[in-house]
């Protein structure tokens, strides 16, 4: 079947049915690729190993992908993108980092058991621009607990150490370029200590009192 990329018409709009067809085509192609990789991994992994990937993306049916190929899905949580250095950050009605609660609830709707593949631990940016400021003292703890409170059963931080080369040289991690002790690694240790006292919540299923429908 031939699927055409949607193009704007004379009225500067697209055909909504063509857009839907194209989006479904992109989603199906991506899901098929994930399924191919998942099947290979499943043949060789240990029984206790899990298969996951991180998302979520608007042009991908993550619900189907999770059912077809994954044990659970994971999410990349970067709340300080809400304060990025562009026009979007100050757009009217922008809920800033408060919308991350909605994002986490959306992930939970895809996979009741889910994890955080990348929890923000430093300032974020590429070699072309800086997008998000450094977390303030205590913010890593706040975001980690927010993820867990929304049902995350797994949290990992991106990245361990800020890389010294490549496109993401300004994407800071727990450690700075020097790899030396800093306040962020001390905060991670404190987070670990707090989570040791909360380990009984691991594996629990989040009980939501409110349901959201997004059309």
Question: Across the structure, where does each feature detected by a protein language model lie?
Answer:
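Glycine-enriched alpha-helix->loop->beta-strand junction motifs that scaffold or abut catalytic
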Residues: 68-73, 151
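Short glycine/serine/threonine-enriched helix-capping/active-site loop
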Residues: 53-54, 75, 117
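Carbohydrate-binding surfaces of carbohydrate-active enzymes
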Residues: 3-4, 31, 35, 43, ...
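Active-site neighborhood of glycoside hydrolase catalytic domains
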Residues: 1-53, 57-69
């Amino acid at each position: 079947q031939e699927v055409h990329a949607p193009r704007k018409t004379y009225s500067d709009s697209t055909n909504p049915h063509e857009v839907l067809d194209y989006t479904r085509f992109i989603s199906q192609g991506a899901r098929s690729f994930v399924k191919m990789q998942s099947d290979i991994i499943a043949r060789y992994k240990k029984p206790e190993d899990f298969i996951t990937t991180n998302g979520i993306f608007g042009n991908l049916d993550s619900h189907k992908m999770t059912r077809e190929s994954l044990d659970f899905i994971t999410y990349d949580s970067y709340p300080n993108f809400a304060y990025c250095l562009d026009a979007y950050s100050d757009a009217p009605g922008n809920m800033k980092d408060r919308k991350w609660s909605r994002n986490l609830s959306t992930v939970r709707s895809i996979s009741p058991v889910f994890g955080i593949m990348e929890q923000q631990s430093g300032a974020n940016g590429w070699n072309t621009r800086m997008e998000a400021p450094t977390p303030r003292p205590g913010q890593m703890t706040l975001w980690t607990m927010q993820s867990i409170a929304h049902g995350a059963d797994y949290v990992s931080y991106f990245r361990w150490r800020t890389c010294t080369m490549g496109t993401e040289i300004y994407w800071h991690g727990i450690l700075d370029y020097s790899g030396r002790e800093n306040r962020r690694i001390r905060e991670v240790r404190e987070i670990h200590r707090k989570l040791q006292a909360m380990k009984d919540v691991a594996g629990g299923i989040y009980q939501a009192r409110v349901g959201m429908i997004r059309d």
